[in-house]
Amino acid sequence: MFPMKKSLLLLFFFGPISLSFCDQERGADEEENGGEVTEQEVKRNILSSIVNGINRALSFFG
């Protein structure tokens, strides 16, 4: 039970950090594209941040 709680804690810790990086990348993309962000880019950034958070949590235990 403890390892599961620890992994969830790490996931919730690294998730917001990844999302903040995603927001920074989105801001840079907005500057390049003249302020336009497509729905596809938003979904891609969110999905990549989730995957990065999971990978960081798994690499911590591996």
Curated annotation (Swiss-Prot):
Tissue: Expressed by the skin glands.
Prodomain residues: 23-44
InterPro entries for this protein: Frog_antimicrobial_propeptide (IPR004275)
Organism of derivation: Amolops loloensis (Lolokou Sucker Frog)
Keywords: Amphibian defense peptide, Antibiotic, Antimicrobial, Cleavage on pair of basic residues, Immunity, Innate immunity, Secreted, Signal
Record-stated family: Belongs to the frog skin active peptide (FSAP) family. Amolopin subfamily.
Gene Ontology cellular component list: extracellular region
Function: Antimicrobial peptide with activity against Gram-positive bacteria. Has been tested against S.aureus (MIC=37.5 ug/mL), against B.pumilus (MIC=75.0 ug/mL), B.cereus (no activity detected). Does not show activity against Gram-negative bacteria (E.coli, B.dysenteriae, A.calcoaceticus, P.aeruginosa) and fungi (C.albicans). Does not show hemolytic activity against rabbit erythrocytes.
Signal peptide range in chain numbering: 1-22
Compartment(s) where it occurs, according to its Swiss-Prot or TrEMBL record: Secreted
Biological process per Gene Ontology, one example term: innate immune response
Protein name from the UniProt record: Amolopin-P1
